[in-house]
Curated annotation (Swiss-Prot):
Stretches the record annotates as Disordered: 1-26, 396-429
Domain JmjC, residue spans: 124-288
Any single GO CC term annotated in Swiss-Prot or TrEMBL for this entry: cytoplasm
Disulfide bonds: none
Subunit and partners: Interacts with CRYAB and HSPB1.
Protein source organism: Bos taurus (Bovine)
Native organism taxonomy: Eukaryota, Metazoa, Chordata, Craniata, Vertebrata
UniProt protein name: HSPB1-associated protein 1
Length: 484
């Protein structure tokens, strides 16, 4: 991607920048940046906000020197074109240093050590979800190299961040994060993001197997979908953007995303921002954990690897899961106080998926609202005051329908954003009027191609019981039942 007008390029940064950086003014104050983040309902890319961060120099080579031979866990995946997602439960893992990773990634024939069994032409490696507090436990000063306070979150730095280092082809399967929203700073190399709005959830065929708290996975390999098995995916609205060094991507709450490294080495830093809705989400996640662990351990108490994501150390007992659930409900009540406030919040969260007009469109609780085709006067005013421009570019829907061929997918590269008439910035207004209808449609379409129309597996049952729409309703019933 070409450098944007007035931007400090990666080459400028590498050469020091000097006086030019000192003169450069960030396009948004911390207060304005936070306002945008807390109000924006679609993904967008920030420009010219991190040119003075020390972390902009954190290449994999630099980090290998900082870590001094520290062992890191890498996820090893195959460079395949399968139609099935490559979940983390299907990957192998190696413990290696960044020096070993860089040597292997350079395709040296004399490679040995942890990567010796993995042909670089057939495998990719990904050091993902590396929390700074563990990775740099003896170098805490480095936390200050990441300055999320520039986005309006005082005191937030590397301590609340994770690091991602990958080779060409490394990716995360399509999923949504149940908690918060996400800021992603691209440091080295480029990553391609495939994003889908929350209201497209029925078309992404959500599943909680493999189980990981805070992640809802899609059954679909979105870059090579099996449309015969998952025909509803044709209705999903793909948004694509290639994130380059020096850019920061904002991922709103509950947006699905599949992320792939498209350069030989990529380095990213992200931070999940807590939101008000997380209080109820904790109840939903506790319900999910209890049901998944109960059914899957009953099915096969000795084989957790097949269903428990490697990020989860072990399955938790029913007693512990009951403790989690009661703790989440207690925390919800402690936060909201009176029973009237609690019930109002529960009802409000329920309506966010069905009645758009009853909620403030310019707030995070409105991310997944339904709505008609007529724009209110308030909506028009908001679009007229759109924050988008040269330094904040929206990620808009792709120009073509998803294809099973990778070459058939087009993307928004962040350069050619639309004009401020509001017609192309917002999400297309399409949403089921009832959350139950969305659940039924997803479940029905998921059974279109099955070996047997009558056999129901434990996973089939769980796909219904812990469908995000179902656990949301159950959580609301639990909360409302205790608010009287």
């Amino acid at each position: 991607m070409a450098a944007r007008p007035g931007a400090i390029t990666n080459a400028d940064s590498a050469s020091g920048g000097g006086e030019e950086e000192g003169k450069h003014v960030k396009p948004f104050t911390p207060e304005k940046a936070k306002e945008i983040i807390m109000c924006l309902q679609q993904p967008a890319v920030f420009y010219n906000m991190v040119f003075d961060w020390p972390a902009q120099h954190w290449t994999a080579k630099h980090l290998s020197e900082v870590l001094h031979g520290k062992q890191i866990r890498f996820r090893m995946g195959t460079k395949s074109t399968d139609t099935a997602p490559q979940f983390e439960t299907a990957c192998n893992y190696v413990e290696a240093t960044l020096e070993e990773f860089l040597s292997w990634n350079s395709d040296q024939s004399s490679i040995s050590g942890a990567f010796r069994d993995y042909d670089h032409s057939k495998f990719w490696a990904y050091a993902d979800y590396k929390y700074f507090v563990s990775l740099f436990e003896d170098k805490t000063d480095i936390f200050q190299d990441v300055i999320w306070s520039d986005f309006g979150f005082p005191g937030r730095n590397g301590q609340e961040s994770t690091l991602w280092i990958g080779s060409l082809g490394a990716h995360t399967p399509c999923h949504l994060d149940t908690y918060g929203c996400n800021l992603v700073f691209q440091v080295q190399g480029r990553k391609r993001w495939h994003l889908f709005p929350p209201e497209d959830t029925p078309f992404l065929y959500p599943t909680r197997i493999p189980y990981e708290e805070s992640s809802v996975f899609s059954k679909i390999n979105v870059v090579n979908p099996d449309l015969k098995r998952f025909p509803q995916f044709r209705k999903a609205r793909r948004h694509m953007v290639t994130l380059s060094p020096g850019q920061v991507l904002f991922v709103p709450r509950h947006w699905w995303h599949y992320v792939e490294s498209i350069d030989p080495v990529t380095v990213s830093i992200n931070s999940w921002i807590e939101l008000e809705e997380d209080h109820q989400t904790r109840v939903e996640e506790a319900i999910t954990r209890m049901l998944v662990c109960a059914l899957k351990t009953a099915e096969n108490p000795h084989n957790t690897r097949a269903w428990l994501n490697p990020t989860e150390l072990e399955e938790t007992s029913h007693e512990i899961n009951c403790h989690y659930l009661n703790g989440a409900i207690s925390a919800f009540f402690n936060h909201y106080g009176t029973s009237e406030v609690v019930e109002t919040q529960a009802l409000r969260t329920n309506r966010e998926y069905t009645i758009k007009e009853e909620l403030n469109m310019h707030s995070h609780v409105g991310v997944e609202q339904a709505g008609g085709h007529n724009l209110s006067s308030e909506t028009v005013k908001q679009e007229a005051a759109s924050p988008f421009g040269l330094d904040l570019v929206p990620v808009t829907p792709s120009s073509e329908e998803p294809s099973s061929e990778r070459g058939g997918i087009f993307e928004n590269d962040g350069e050619d954003f639309v004009s401020k008439n509001g017609k192309s910035f917002g999400k297309r207004q399409r949403m089921m009027s009832e959350s139950e209808n969305a659940v039924v449609e997803q479940i029905a379409s998921d059974r279109t191609v099955a070996v047997s129309q009558t056999f129901v597996s434990t996973d089939d049952l769980l796909d219904c019981l812990v469908n995000p729409q179902v656990t949301r309703i159950v959580a609301q019933l639990l909360i409302q039942g205790r608010s009287t």
